[in-house]
């Protein structure tokens, strides 16, 4: 693609602000702007004009249908397609799309998770247009980003609470900015940049593995001779087949207005990453959902399959999603960007203090937002941050915080340089913060990088939590400082008190070190090791009170989300255990039994001929013993599957305590049998095929 074509391609399938300026009247465009920036209502006449322009634009580009595109609590996206046609005279049709069609739709909500927010027979749900998210074209359909709510008004999606949290943190942050004399900023916008990791495998091999097709990850697989020990895949040369996929992916994402910026190989074989430019949290969430969908579709065009599971292969790194979060004013200021020197920037330090306090007080809830079975395979496994929340600030910023706590003057080290050691190369200015890859929440110069997210999950939940927690702390600060008679003195006291009271959450060391887990326990930090431990904190009183107070969730809405996550935990493990049992019964046990029998027959024939058969006997004996144990393990797993309690919380605990050990035992035995079996006798592709064939 030529350089000239790229600007034309970008956003070509998006009904964006530039297109609105071209196609709407000045009055209608301004009405839409007021709706987005000020929350003003949109008159039906303006909605009709926007709908008409949107339809004309879409039809010109080959669209025949439209859909209200929304994000239910499944974590995926949903859409129902309606054509533009309407009956006309003489058996003909006309194309129609009104303001009412744009602004509101009706969906059967009975098949989406609701967590008890509606009865089964209460099927009616409503979708409502989000005017702050641009409509886009996907495969001949005009997609209109919307929210989803029940007939009773409860939020049944992930976008509604995200929008609420963005408004709330903006409101509280503006109060703080006013105290510092900022009278220009009208809004504060949470901005997010999610780095998306993924695996690519050959489609033919994928189709031969029931576990990949049913669960998205391998449930069996012996360690191959080579994994990621050579450290040669990370940032390595991109193979032609993968490069073709990435090029196609970029072009499709750019056409959809998604700021795909960086692409590279990741640490594990067959693992890669795409990182976008930061944008507002609402758009970033829409874009990330769309990115995951487009990745899967583009991969199929290249006879590949894109795996978004957190741990598709044992023994090599899994996939995460680093969530880079910051607060920016509508005048272009990043509130987490220090001034000329951080020590002189009181406003920055106050926002930093709010973040530190919030993460400390709601560390359990932040952990719960990333809690699900797939992520349990990553967190704390020396490839991802531990399950203990902590904040990395870097040496200089931590030194500033410590000087504030001690009441001593901070002596700035000055700008350091990196000496390369080559005469022709100039010294390079060194950043004030290093990149601590082991930290779950790292300050990286002008933002915080929340590194605990799983690769497959929606980024809405974690960002709703960050926005709401920050809003709570800023509200407390504003309530206190707005009454101050001596602002500067009270500000300094507040910052010192907050850092003193919450310094336990700050940790700049190696999060992979076992010593840190012991130290975290001494500090009183929570260590919710598994999703089964973390999910119940959704409904802890302090957490429910927080979200209800700020109007992000009603009590019913947050309880519903907890119930959905808890039920999903058991559902995922049940599907994995059933898939494992099916593969054992129909593929692995027959294959290993057949090969063991062949060894015995071969040994008997050698015996008749007086030829040594010690090797055959030894392998047959080990395989026979392992097969018996594997058969027993399969039966136990099937028995345990039949005993799952009806109560959701009990079922989650039972699945964690019984199904996971059952699956681990079965896998251990099966993987050893794979190592003893000839390649041609194993019933499906092995790791060396899957990881090194693309």
Question: PLM features: residue spans?
Answer:
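Hydrophobic/aromatic-rich, well-ordered segments within soluble, folded domains that form packed cores
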Residues: 63, 67-71, 287-301, 327, ...
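Glycine-rich, acidic/polar active-site loops that bind/position phosphate-bearing ligands
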Residues: 123-308, 317-320, 327-565
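Short linear, low-complexity motifs centered on an aromatic residue
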Residues: 75-90, 107-110, 209, 216-218, ...
């Amino acid at each position: 693609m030529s350089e000239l074509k790229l600007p034309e391609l970008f956003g070509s399938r998006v009904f964006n602000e530039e297109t609105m300026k071209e196609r709407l009247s000045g009055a209608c465009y301004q009405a839409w702007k007021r709706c987005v920036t000020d929350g003003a209502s949109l008159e039906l006449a303006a909605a009709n004009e926007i709908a008409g322009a949107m339809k004309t634009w879409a039809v010109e580009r080959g669209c025949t249908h439209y859909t209200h595109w929304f994000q239910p609590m499944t974590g995926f996206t949903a859409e129902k397609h309606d054509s533009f046609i309407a009956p006309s005279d003489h058996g003909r049709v006309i194309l129609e799309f009104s303001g009412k069609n744009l602004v509101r739709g009706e969906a059967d909500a009975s098949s989406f998770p609701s967590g008890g927010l509606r009865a089964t027979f209460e099927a009616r749900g409503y979708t409502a247009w989000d005017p702050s998210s641009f409509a886009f074209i996907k495969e001949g359909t005009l997609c209109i980003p919307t929210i989803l709510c029940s007939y009773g008004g409860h939020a049944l999606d992930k976008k509604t609470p995200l929008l609420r949290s963005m408004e709330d943190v903006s409101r509280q942050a503006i109060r703080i900015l006013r105290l510092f004399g900022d009278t220009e900023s009208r809004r504060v916008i949470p901005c997010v940049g999610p780095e998306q990791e993924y695996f690519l495998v050959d489609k033919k091999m994928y189709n031969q593995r029931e576990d990949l097709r049913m669960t998205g990850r391998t449930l069996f697989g012996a360690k191959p001779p080579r994994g990621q020990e050579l450290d040669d895949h990370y940032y390595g040369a991109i193979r032609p087949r993968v490069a073709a996929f990435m090029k196609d992916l970029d072009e499709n994402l750019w056409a959809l207005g998604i700021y795909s910026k960086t692409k590279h190989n990741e640490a594990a074989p067959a693992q890669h990453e795409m990182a976008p430019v930061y944008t507002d949290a609402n758009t970033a969430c829409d874009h990330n959902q769309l990115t995951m969908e487009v990745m899967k579709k583009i991969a199929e065009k290249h006879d590949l399959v894109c795996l978004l599971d957190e741990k598709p292969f044992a023994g090599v790194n899994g996939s995460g999603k680093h969530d880079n979060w910051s607060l920016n004013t509508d005048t272009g200021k990043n509130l987490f960007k220090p001034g000329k020197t951080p020590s002189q920037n009181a406003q920055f330090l106050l926002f930093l203090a709010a973040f530190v306090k919030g993460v400390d007080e709601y560390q359990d809830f932040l952990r719960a937002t990333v809690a699900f079975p797939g992520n349990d395979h990553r967190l704390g496994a020396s490839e991802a941050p531990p399950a203990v929340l902590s904040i990395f600030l870097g040496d200089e910023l931590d030194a500033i915080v410590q000087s504030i706590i001690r009441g001593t003057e901070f002596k700035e080290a000055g700008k350091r340089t990196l000496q390369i050691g080559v005469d022709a190369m100039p010294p390079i200015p060194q950043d004030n913060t290093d990149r601590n890859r082991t930290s779950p929440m790292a300050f990286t110069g002008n933002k915080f990088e929340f590194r605990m997210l799983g690769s497959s999950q929606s980024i809405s939940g974690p960002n709703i939590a960050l926005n709401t927690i920050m809003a709570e702390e800023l509200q407390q600060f504003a309530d206190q400082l707005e009454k101050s008679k001596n602002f500067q003195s009270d500000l300094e006291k507040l910052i010192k008190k907050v850092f003193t009271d919450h310094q336990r959450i700050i940790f700049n060391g190696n999060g992979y070190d076992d010593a840190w887990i012991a130290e975290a326990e001494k500090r009183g930090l929570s260590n919710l090791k598994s999703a089964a431990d973390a999910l119940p904190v959704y409904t802890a009183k302090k957490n429910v009170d927080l979200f209800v107070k700020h109007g992000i969730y009603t009590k019913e809405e947050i309880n519903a989300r907890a119930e959905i996550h808890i039920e999903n935990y058991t559902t995922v493990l049940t599907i994995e255990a059933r898939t494992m049992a099916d593969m054992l019964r129909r593929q692995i046990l027959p294959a290993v039994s057949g090969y063991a029998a062949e060894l015995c027959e071969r040994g008997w024939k050698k015996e008749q001929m007086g030829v040594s058969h010690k090797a055959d006997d030894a392998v047959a004996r080990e395989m026979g013993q392992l097969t018996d144990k594997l058969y027993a393990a399969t039966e136990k797993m099937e028995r345990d599957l039949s005993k799952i309690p009806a109560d959701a919380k009990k079922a989650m605990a039972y699945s964690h305590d019984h199904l996971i050990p059952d699956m681990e035992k079965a896998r251990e035995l099966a993987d050893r049998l794979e190592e003893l079996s000839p390649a041609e006798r194993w019933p499906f592709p092995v790791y060396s095929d899957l990881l090194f064939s693309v």
